[in-house]
Structure formats: structure tokens, C-alpha cells
Amino acid sequence: MRRVKRIVQYPYGRMAMESGVGVTVVVMDTGMALHPELYGQAVMFLDLINGRNDFYDDNGHGTHVCGIIAGRQIGMAPNAKLIVLKVLDETGNGNVVYSMRGFRWILENQEKYNIRIVNISMGMKAGTNILGEKRILKGAEMLWDMGIVVVTAAGNLGPRDGSITIPGVSKKVITVGASDNMHSGRGSWQKAIYKPELVAPGSNIFSCNSDYANGKLYIGKSGTSMATPIVSGAAALLLSKEPNLTNDSVKRRLQNCCTDLHMSKSRQGSGLINIRKLLQY
């Protein structure tokens, strides 16, 4: 994560002192293992697949994502709090029913836990389940309409245009591509899908290993799933500094404070997230 923080111009020292204080981020994923970086970082774990009460991650994807957002040492916003909803199984696959249960739980508990951000490092390929796609889109947009910052992955079906996954195609949510991955999902300007909003590093990102007991605390993973929590963490930094911002304001600020990579808009959106610029704006 040190490499990532250099790339996105993470501000050490005074500008990052708050580092997510007062912000709760929901992670909808495969779960979270109690990795040393994540002790005390989660205020709630809800297993919507197997109904278990203990923290666990039978895939590793969710633990990795959680570490990027709020790992004690490596996280983008180490003072943010996490709520982890397990909506993906041990293979990393999901079911529309579990995701919809997650969306409903968030809406019902938004005020209780001061939920400001939802990280969705998953997606459905467009055209595979039309009814399911509509439900997922509606669920994500309901969160946005309630003032929550919804940050979702662009998917890894690129480089062809129009390869953004669901719910990333929504005009409301913040869709994140990977700046250094040719397979990052692309928008389609011909179809007026002006996506992604921005990009972040997504190749060989080192974060928490769910199988840390084997002595390997960190593991590298790649994809827009890894780029997305970088942006969620940045949003937590911003909301910690300026808690009265609306989700629309957060979206505009993120896009206005990017570094242009001189790539096509369908690949980079507004550009590479620049956190120093974001917090100095």
C-alpha cells in the first residue's frame, strides 16, 4: 500500500490526522477475517449467506478490501469504522437475493451506525440476468437516494467499450476503474454511459491476507475490486474532514481532483484519484 499511497498522493502528517474519524463504511463482500490489521475496525459483521455470528472470510476477497479501506497500518482511512456484510460465497459469487437483503439492512440501519459509504467491489455482467440486474441497480440507487456514497467497481471485462458491470453502469453511483489494468471495465460514450467516474491503482495491491495464520500477513491481488476501496477510503478521509458534504458533492470533488492520465474518457473517466488535491480543494 505504500506504493499505492505514493501514486495517489496520500497526504501524511497533519492533512491525514483525522483519517476517517466519524465515518462508517459498509463493505459488501465475502466477509472479513480478524486479521491483526483489522482488530477493532469493524463494528458489525452480518453473514447473509450462512448465518454465522463470528467474523470469517472463506474466500479472502473481502478481507483484502477491508484492509485497503481501514487497515490499522496500511489502510487509506484507518480511523474509519467498518460494517461487513457477507453477500458473496466462498467462490466469490453472489446471489441477487443476498445483495438485496444487504441493501435493505443498510437502509434500515443507516442512521443507527452513521453509514456514509458503501463499498461494492463486485458486479454482474450486463445481459446475463435482466431482472436481477434491474433489482441490483435499484438497490444501489436507493442507497444513493438516501444520501449514501456508493462506490462500485467497473469490473474486469475490458478493454472493449461498454464493459462496465452492474451496478457500475448507474449514473448515480461512483464507478471506479483500475488505472493500471487493461481489462478494467470501460464505459460507452456512444450509449451515453459516461463511466467510470475515475480510476485508482488496481494491479498487485498488497493488503490483508485472510489466511494470515500461515505467517503471510499480506497478499497481492489485482482488479477493479482493489481500486474501488482506495476511492472509498479517500471518500472517508474527505467526509471526516467535511462531514456535511452530500454524496453528490463527494462525487464532484472526487472527479474534480483527479490527475489526467491522457487516456480515453471511457477508460479513465476524470483521471487518477489525487488525494492531496482532494483534501486541499
Show which residues each predicted segment covers.
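Autoinhibitory propeptides
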Residues: M1-R14
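Subtilisin-like serine protease catalytic core
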Residues: R14-V26, T30-M44, R52-V97, Y113-R116, ...
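Extracellular S/T/G-rich loop segment that most often corresponds to the catalytic His/Ser-adjacent loop
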Residues: V23, D29-M32, G168-S240, L278
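Secreted peptidase-domain scaffold signal
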Residues: G155, I275-Y281
